[in-house]
Regions:
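Radical SAM [4Fe-4S] cluster-binding motif and immediate context
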Residues: 29-182, 187-189, 198, 202
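C-terminal accessory regions of radical SAM enzymes
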Residues: 13, 195-205
Length: 205
């Protein structure tokens, strides 16, 4: 933004800017300024930003150009430790995409005894060690993008790594580790028929 402001003052504003992303936060966010009545929780933070996947429907892939960034684990843990609440939310796009980073983060969070929710990929449903680490760290819920039960629709959106036949076992794995699952589902793909609503509801049940 410094360069943008300088260009405005100089009358040389460019049509587009592309900069490196820094996830360093120089000081604690002044959460006391927030009206907590207006939020599910005023204690929301992030450890990572972006996602390496390139799902066609997702703005994150375009905005971050399928890049993935991480904050220092120690910074995240220190921020969470300072929360005056036993509950908080990670607003990360895909918190567990870097497994080694996620494991280090969960190890750092575990001693704090806080509870939290996040977004993650359904593909971690077969990683028992990672799920166990999430549980120890206090994770109680995840939002995952099922998107659709139609493999052709998934392939058309560059999300063929989602496999509908594994949905049930993946969700069950989250449940075994004490996490509720909020599923993101979409309809209206070119491969869908008018029956998609009934079929999707039946599959979810």
């Amino acid at each position: 933004w410094q360069r943008v402001c300088e260009d405005i003052q100089a009358g040389t504003l460019q049509r587009r800017y592309r900069g490196d992303v820094s996830l360093g936060i120089p000081k604690t966010v002044p959460r006391q300024l927030l009206d907590k009545r207006q939020y599910v929780t005023a204690h929301a933070t992030f450890a990572t930003m972006g996602c390496r996947n390139a799902c066609r429907f997702c703005s994150i892939a375009k905005f971050h150009e399928s890049r993935f960034f991480t904050r220092p684990v120690a910074d995240v843990v220190a921020e969470v430790a300072a929360f005056d609440s036993p509950f908080f939310m990670f607003v990360d796009d895909n918190l567990t995409q870097d497994r080694d980073y996620a494991m280090a983060l969960f190890e750092g969070l575990a001693p704090l005894g806080k509870r939290w929710i996040t977004q993650a990929s359904l593909t971690i449903g077969d990683d028992e060690a990672l799920l166990a680490a999430m549980q120890r760290a206090g994770c109680t819920g995840v939002f995952v993008g099922l998107e659709t039960f139609n493999p052709d629709a998934l392939a058309s959106q560059q999300k063929a790594f989602n496999t509908p036949e594994k949905y049930r076992t993946a969700v069950a794995a989250f449940h075994r580790h004490g996490m509720y699952v909020e599923a993101g589902v979409m309809v209206g793909f070119d491969h869908d028929s008018p029956a998609v609503f009934r079929e999707t509801l039946k599959s979810l049940e």
